[in-house]
């Protein structure tokens, strides 16, 4: 079984009820953090997960709302782990990730220096191990495998999605994307698809062109549902709601998805959990 927790279901626009985009995936005793939007560690703490328990950080792309708390994750993992030899944090993301991580650590260089000077058991900066990928298998430990596939969030490029598998259960995390062949291939036959969504009907009615531009490179609720249907997934999990999902609107969003996808649809607030069991997907892709 794989457990998916929507840590942050918000967007770039600050929302008092929603943290920034981030999803926690637990499988085979391992814990994967997918993106790290604002407030991610507070939300992780609410489900009993600390920064020092993260097996790997997976980044779908380098938009600010998806990496806003990267520095907090790196520093907090470092200072809250008391093992004598802290292993590097695996960080897997698209090309450009290494530069972002390097610059983030530079931004915290004063803080890092203060802590090394103060604490005898902190002798080196936060250890990281960055892998930049666009396609292929990136993880295979203790019967958990992770595969990466390309998505389409242009002009943001390259962007990637992740497929996590464990003992016959599988979850795909799409990140921000429009419908594309790469995501269809990655999600084919998966137990669950976690997909960011927008309400195109609401956004296109707004007067600000910069806001309407969002429609260019995000999937609408209906498009995400169509992707799930084409891929034959068992559960569609919606997140990253734009505009923000207001209390009482859940059924409206779910109904839109249900016009294009006739299986289980999950939508909710931060900390919403979904269990994905082996064999949950009974439909072939196509």
Swiss-Prot record:
SMART domains: Lactamase_B (SM00849). This is Ribonuclease Z. One of its GO terms (molecular function) is 3'-tRNA processing endoribonuclease activity. Zn(2+) 2 binds at residues 65-66, 176, 240. Zn(2+) 1 binds at residues 61, 63, 153, 176. Binds 2 Zn(2+) ions. Homodimer. It comes from Mycolicibacterium gilvum (strain PYR-GCK). Its EC number is 3.1.26.11. The active site is at residue 65. InterPro entries: AtsA-like_MBL-fold, Metallo-B-lactamas, RibonucZ/Hydroxyglut_hydro, RNase_Z/BN. PANTHER family: ZINC PHOSPHODIESTERASE ELAC PROTEIN 1. The keyword tRNA processing applies. Keywords: Endonuclease, Hydrolase, Metal-binding, Nuclease, tRNA processing, Zinc. Belongs to the RNase Z family. It comes from the Bacteria. Its cofactor is Zn(2+). The keyword Repressor does not apply. It is an enzyme of class 3 (hydrolase). It catalyses: Endonucleolytic cleavage of RNA, removing extra 3' nucleotides from tRNA precursor, generating 3' termini of tRNAs. A 3'-hydroxy group is left at the tRNA terminus and a 5'-phosphoryl group is left at the trailer molecule. Zinc phosphodiesterase, which displays some tRNA 3'-processing endonuclease activity. Probably involved in tRNA maturation, by removing a 3'-trailer from precursor tRNA.
């Amino acid at each position: 079984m794989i457990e998916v927790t929507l840590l942050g279901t918000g967007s770039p626009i600050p929302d008092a009820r929603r943290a920034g985009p981030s999803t926690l995936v637990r499988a085979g005793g391992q814990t994967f953090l997918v993106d790290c939007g604002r407030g991610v560690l507070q939300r992780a703490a609410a489900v009993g997960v600390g920064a020092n328990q993260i097996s790997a950080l997976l980044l779908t792309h380098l938009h600010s709302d998806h990496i806003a708390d990267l520095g907090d994750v790196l520093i907090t993992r470092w200072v809250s782990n008391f093992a004598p030899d802290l292993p590097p944090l695996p960080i897997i993301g698209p090309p450009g990730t290494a530069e972002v991580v390097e610059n983030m650590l530079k931004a915290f260089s004063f803080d890092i220096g203060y802590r090394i000077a103060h604490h005898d058991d902190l002798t080196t900066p936060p250890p990281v191990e960055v892998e930049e990928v666009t396609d292929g298998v990136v993880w295979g430990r203790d019967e958990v495998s992770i595969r990466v596939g390309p998505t389409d969030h242009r002009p943001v490029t390259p962007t990637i999605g992740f497929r996590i598998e464990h003992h016959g259960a599988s979850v795909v995390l799409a990140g921000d994307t429009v419908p594309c062949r790469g995501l269809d291939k990655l999600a084919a036959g998966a137990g669950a698809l976690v997909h960011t969504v927008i309400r195109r009907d609401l956004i296109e009615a707004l007067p600000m062109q910069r806001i309407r531009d969002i429609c260019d490179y995000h999937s609408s609720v209906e498009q995400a549902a169509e992707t799930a249907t084409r891929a034959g997934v068992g559960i569609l999990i919606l997140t990253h709601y734009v505009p923000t999902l207001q209390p009482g609107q859940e059924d409206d969003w779910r109904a839109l998805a249900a016009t294009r996808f006739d299986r289980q649809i999950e939508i909710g607030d931060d900390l919403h959990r979904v269990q994905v069991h082996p064999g949950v997907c009974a439909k072939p892709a196509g």
